[in-house]
Amino acid sequence: MNTSDHPAPAAYDVIVVGGGHAGCEAAAAAARTGAITALVTHQAATIGEMSCNPAIGGIGKGHLVREIDALDGLMGRAIDQACIHFKMLNRSKGPAVRGPRAQADRKLYKKAVQDILHTTPHLSIIEGSVEDLITSSGTQQTVQGVILQDGRHLSASAVVLTTGTFLRGVIHCGEQRSEAGRVGEAPSIGLAKRLDALNLRMGRLKTGTPPRIDRRSIAWEDLPEDRGENPPTPFSTLNHHIDLPQISCRISETTADTHQIIRDNLHRSAVYGGMLSGKGPRYCPSIEDKVVRFPDKTRHQVFLEPEGLDDFTVYPNGISTSLPAEVQEALLHSMPGLHNAVIIRPGYAVEYDFVDPRSLRPSLELKELPGLFLAGQINGTTGYEEAGAQGLMAGLNAARKAQGLDSVTLDRSQAYIGVLIDDLTTHGVTEPYRMFTSRSEFRLTLRADNADRRLTRWGRQAGCVSDERWKTFAAYDQAMNDALTLAAQDTRTPVQLQQVGITVRQDGRRRPLLSLIGSDPEQDQKLNQAFPWLHDLDPRVREQLEIEGAYSGYLSRQDKERRVLQQEDTILLSDHIDYSAIGGLSAEIRDKLQSLRPTSLGAASRMEGMTPAALAAISHFVRRKQCFT
């Protein structure tokens, strides 16, 4: 791999701008296809930085990480090399909504990401600030490369922008304001102006981070312990165990004094003082938002999460803030265990530009400028996992475009990645978008535990899955198929089942194992006696067999719904349809269709305000006129 201090070719297939989570996945995915790829970033040393919380996964988010891993992405492998505290959220609930979450040693996570990138063939890393795009001349412009601040021109067939919070980024800490995408790092102004010139729909969003605390100043013994699961469960199917020591967190909480300090200083908050206008994430509110929105709540939990095994920095999860530094210190000192807390770095809010994701095709290519792909917070999302998922798909499609291949997409029935991109490109955002399992209509099928069975074969065909990944998956997939076949064919009579303590109706009908397994943990143990071959199964295969058995009836129903969705999504709509020529459409629907230009009948059906009658009229029109792309 070429680095910034080695000679690099002037021409690439794909250039990725930005070294955050979206950029790393995009660059690696493009390179895995064989595309000659360059990752351009301000500082190579910050590649893979965890800018906010030191954790990966969670409810919905953990599903995305498993899907990224199934497509041979970086995130799952990196967190397995950095995990110091693991929990399976919602473990007491059904497998469909369980969310793996791991806290990371920040330094080890960043090192793991950089190590993977440094050993990825076809990938170069270039230090520099991209200030402009190179485009072709003519009426239908296409991207042809980028221009760096120092004057260098890099040509490429496709470019992926993953600018994160750097696009005209401004940091706020109380009354203090500084132009930056991250503390101490300059924002991207030139690219923002370039996007302005394309007349795209754009807006401002914000996110925030809490103050970091010196671990040595916390009274740990006064606080309840929050233990993780040990042994932790790996995210990546390439890993069987995690070797790092596991540590506990501690739990503090806000008090009545904390809330009064916040109320007394709301006017000094960047958000409530009117110093920024961007909308923040609904599901990750600042402590100011919590106090204002929930005035009857007397306390809010704060999880004290160490940022590393040999790091004195602690991340107080739950008190993101843009209050002045001295107010942050006062509110910390009003909380149990933190009376003497020393702030290493104050919290702050960052406001940045984003592009309305309805300007994108499902491939994440910009409709207005072919060859330019966007991924991550520039599309209005929040979170490492959402960024990484978009980055992988954008990098894959950018590479395919450079190679003269058609784009590939995942639909809502295939993956949470498909749900994410469909929500963005169909509905747009009014606030930072975060993934939840509740956003999917097919969550019984789209589980974190079966991501590889859903996606690795698809990824292999698309060109982003390596030989190593494929070999590992193929062996597991064969074992799983063999177990499912045997479980469907191997039967026992009611009498045989009764002999091992399993009660079923005595109707003489033989029961296959698949109809019995997974419904009752105690019964599953008895099944070992009736079906001795279960003892020899790999633990993961056994677990999957139990889940498939428990969900078998529901899965068949979801499969029918999936086929209906896929049928609508295969009817593609041309960019050149004249919706004014379609009778039976209201003015509101016609205007939305003309503006948003949905790429398929399925996407049109999910537009706000769409009616069955209008959808039928569009379907009839395109079938009659054969207006397919």
From Swiss-Prot:
Instruction: Report the locations given in the UniProt record.
Output: Cytoplasm
Needed cofactors: FAD
Q: Does the keyword Ribosomal protein apply?
A: no
Keywords from the UniProt entry: Cytoplasm, FAD, Flavoprotein, NAD, tRNA processing
Q: Which GO terms describe its molecular function?
A: flavin adenine dinucleotide binding
In terms of PANTHER family, this protein maps to: GLUCOSE INHIBITED DIVISION PROTEIN A, PROTEIN MTO1 HOMOLOG, MITOCHONDRIAL
Q: What is this protein called?
A: tRNA uridine 5-carboxymethylaminomethyl modification enzyme MnmG
